[in-house]
Amino acid sequence: MKVSELFMPTLKETPSDAEIESHKLMLRSGFMRQLSSGIYVYLPLGYRVLRKIENIVREEMDRSGAQEVHMSALMPKELWEESGRWAVFGPEMFRIKDRNEREYCLGPTHEEAFTYIVRNEISSYRDLPKILYQIQTKFRDERRPRFGVMRCREFTMKDAYSFDIDENGLDISYQKMYDAYVRIFKRCGLDVKIVEADTGAMGGASSHEFMVPSSVGEAEIAYCKACGYAANLEKAECLDEPVENKEEPKEKQEVYTPNVRTIEELVSFLGIDSTRFVKTMIYKADDKFVAVLVRGDREVNETKLKNLLKATDLELASAEDVEKITGAKVGFAGPIGLSIDVYADNEVKYLKNFVVGANKTDYHIKNVNLSDFKVTKFTDLRNITQDDLCPKCRSQKVTIERGIEVGHIFKLGTKYTQAFNCVYTDEKGEKKLMIMGCYGIGINRTAAAIIEQMHDEDGIIWPITVAPYEVIIVPVNVKDENQKKIAFEIYENLQRNGVEVLIDDRDERAGVKFKDADLIGIPFRVTVGKKISEGKLEIRNRRTKESFEVEIEKAIEVVINLIREEKAKYQI
C-alpha cells in the first residue's frame, strides 16, 4: 500500500478529550474517530489491527475445537424473560420496540441466544460436548463512556459457550478455553495476569479474569509474588487471623462530635487511631436493609456482601433511609440498638473498646464492645490491602495494582440451562441438564491494552503479530529517481514474498515520514537515502530503536529474516 493513497489522517496535536495513552494514540495515529459518545469508527489502519486480533482469536478457538457461529445482535424480550434477566440486567441494556410495539434488546451478551439454539438442536449425550463461539458486536448503554474503547457503548467481543454432560466435562472445556486464552494473549504480545474473579451477574461456580497490569485499569488485582496467587479485589479473600486482645472492657462513653462524620475527621477530632473505630454502613439489598461493620481503616467489599445476601441489587441506603433506621443523620450510624440484621467483618471479632456512631446526630460512643450489640454473622466483608498476607500461602503480603480486563471465563453450571430447560438424554434414557461455561474476549479493549503496554513518546509500538503492516519503506527524497526506483523495487519484492508492506511515497520531508512511521507503530522501517550511492540502506527496529545498514542486494533477505525472528517471539 502506498501511503499517498492510504486513508491515514494522523494528528499532530492530542485531542483534549482523550485521557489515556491508548485513546490519544488511536486518535492521533488515524486508527479511529469518534462518531458519538462511546461510539467509534475504525479507519483502515485501526481496522487492520482489529482484524489481526480477531484472526489470532479465531485460529486459537478453532485449534481448541470450538466452532464459529454468528448470532443476531437483536434479540427478543421473551428470550431474556425466559432466563429472568430482562429486568435484572438494568439500564446498561439497550431496549427497543419495533413498529408493532414488540420489545427487543441489542445484545450486551449472548448466553440466552446460545442456550436457546442448543436446547432446540441438541438432545442426546452423543452430540456433546460442544463449544460454540462468535465474534460479534455488543452494545451496552454505559452511564459514562470513557477512556476511548476501554469503556464504550458499542464494541466487538469474542464470546464462546461450552455445553457438557457433567462437571468433569465442564472442567475439560474450561481448561481448553483457559489454555487458548493464554496462547491468544501471548500471540498478541500482552503481559497478562490470570486472576480469580467473582462471577457477578453472569452467575456460576468459578471464574478467571485475564488482566493487563496498567495504571489506567478500572479493576484492582491482588497477587502474591511468592506463590503466584492472584485475584481481583472483589474476589480476594481476607484471612480470618485471630488477634489476642487482653484489654479489659471499659465503660461506654458518649462523646459530642459536632458535624464530625468521616473516619479522617474523627481521628483528628478524638486523637484516636483509625483501627480503633468500627464503621457502620447501612445498605439496601433488594428490598431489605442491613448494617455492615468494618474496622475504621477498612472498606466494605460490596461484592462479598452481595453474594452473602444473595442479593440481585445492592446499594448504600439513602440519607433519608439511614435517618429512619438509625434516628441519626449520615455519619453517626452505629450498631447498638439497631432493629435490622448486622453483619460484621471478621476483624471486628477481635476488637475491644472501639468507637462507633451513637445513632444520634453529632454523637459517637467510645469503649464499645461486642457484648453491647448483636451481630447476625461474622464473615469476610472487606477489601484486601497490601498489609494483608496472601490467603493461599500465608507467607508474604500481597501486592495490589490496577489492571485492564481483556478476557473473562466462567463456569456457569446450570444457571441458564435450567432456566431454558436445556436438557440432553443420557445413555440410560434419562433427561439431564447440560452444564455450561462462557468465555469472553474484548477485541477493541485488547487493542487498547496493547497500546497501554507498548508505546513511547513517539507513538505506538505494535507487536508484529497485530501491527497493521510489518514494514514501511521510506524513500527520503521521492524526487530522486534512483531512491524512488530502489524503494519501489524493494517494496514490490517484499510484497511478492508475502510481507505486509507500506511505502511512504509522499513528497514530504523525511522527518515527517519518520514521525508518522513511529506514530503508527510499524515494526520495521527501511530507509532509502543518500547511502544508496554506496550500495547501502538503513533498517530500523521500532521496538528497540536500533538501526543498522545493509547492502541493497541483501535487504530483502535481511528484512524477511527479521520478520521471521520477530514473529517467533510471539509463538506458543
Swiss-Prot record:
<comment type="function">
    <text>Catalyzes the attachment of proline to tRNA(Pro) in a two-step reaction: proline is first activated by ATP to form Pro-AMP and then transferred to the acceptor end of tRNA(Pro). As ProRS can inadvertently accommodate and process non-cognate amino acids such as alanine and cysteine, to avoid such errors it has two additional distinct editing activities against alanine. One activity is designated as 'pretransfer' editing and involves the tRNA(Pro)-independent hydrolysis of activated Ala-AMP.</text>
</comment>
<dbReference type="InterPro" id="IPR004500">
    <property type="entry name" value="Pro-tRNA-synth_IIa_bac-type"/>
</dbReference>
<dbReference type="GO" id="GO:0005524">
    <property type="term" value="F:ATP binding"/>
</dbReference>
<dbReference type="Pfam" id="PF00587">
    <property type="entry name" value="tRNA-synt_2b"/>
</dbReference>
<comment type="subunit">
    <text>Homodimer.</text>
</comment>
<dbReference type="InterPro" id="IPR036754">
    <property type="entry name" value="YbaK/aa-tRNA-synt-asso_dom_sf"/>
</dbReference>
<dbReference type="InterPro" id="IPR036621">
    <property type="entry name" value="Anticodon-bd_dom_sf"/>
</dbReference>
<protein>
    <recommendedName>
        <fullName>Proline--tRNA ligase</fullName>
        <ecNumber>6.1.1.15</ecNumber>
    </recommendedName>
</protein>
<dbReference type="InterPro" id="IPR002314">
    <property type="entry name" value="aa-tRNA-synt_IIb"/>
</dbReference>
<dbReference type="GO" id="GO:0002161">
    <property type="term" value="F:aminoacyl-tRNA deacylase activity"/>
</dbReference>
<dbReference type="InterPro" id="IPR033730">
    <property type="entry name" value="ProRS_core_prok"/>
</dbReference>
<comment type="similarity">
    <text>Belongs to the class-II aminoacyl-tRNA synthetase family. ProS type 1 subfamily.</text>
</comment>
<dbReference type="Pfam" id="PF03129">
    <property type="entry name" value="HGTP_anticodon"/>
</dbReference>
<keyword id="KW-0030">Aminoacyl-tRNA synthetase</keyword>
<dbReference type="GO" id="GO:0004827">
    <property type="term" value="F:proline-tRNA ligase activity"/>
</dbReference>
<keyword id="KW-0963">Cytoplasm</keyword>
<dbReference type="GO" id="GO:0016740">
    <property type="term" value="F:transferase activity"/>
</dbReference>
<keyword id="KW-0547">Nucleotide-binding</keyword>
<dbReference type="InterPro" id="IPR045864">
    <property type="entry name" value="aa-tRNA-synth_II/BPL/LPL"/>
</dbReference>
<dbReference type="InterPro" id="IPR006195">
    <property type="entry name" value="aa-tRNA-synth_II"/>
</dbReference>
<dbReference type="InterPro" id="IPR007214">
    <property type="entry name" value="YbaK/aa-tRNA-synth-assoc-dom"/>
</dbReference>
<dbReference type="Pfam" id="PF04073">
    <property type="entry name" value="tRNA_edit"/>
</dbReference>
<dbReference type="InterPro" id="IPR044140">
    <property type="entry name" value="ProRS_anticodon_short"/>
</dbReference>
<dbReference type="InterPro" id="IPR002316">
    <property type="entry name" value="Pro-tRNA-ligase_IIa"/>
</dbReference>
<dbReference type="GO" id="GO:0140096">
    <property type="term" value="F:catalytic activity, acting on a protein"/>
</dbReference>
<keyword id="KW-0436">Ligase</keyword>
<keyword id="KW-0648">Protein biosynthesis</keyword>
<dbReference type="GO" id="GO:0006433">
    <property type="term" value="P:prolyl-tRNA aminoacylation"/>
</dbReference>
<dbReference type="InterPro" id="IPR004154">
    <property type="entry name" value="Anticodon-bd"/>
</dbReference>
<dbReference type="InterPro" id="IPR023717">
    <property type="entry name" value="Pro-tRNA-Synthase_IIa_type1"/>
</dbReference>
<dbReference type="InterPro" id="IPR050062">
    <property type="entry name" value="Pro-tRNA_synthetase"/>
</dbReference>
<keyword id="KW-0067">ATP-binding</keyword>
<dbReference type="GO" id="GO:0005829">
    <property type="term" value="C:cytosol"/>
</dbReference>
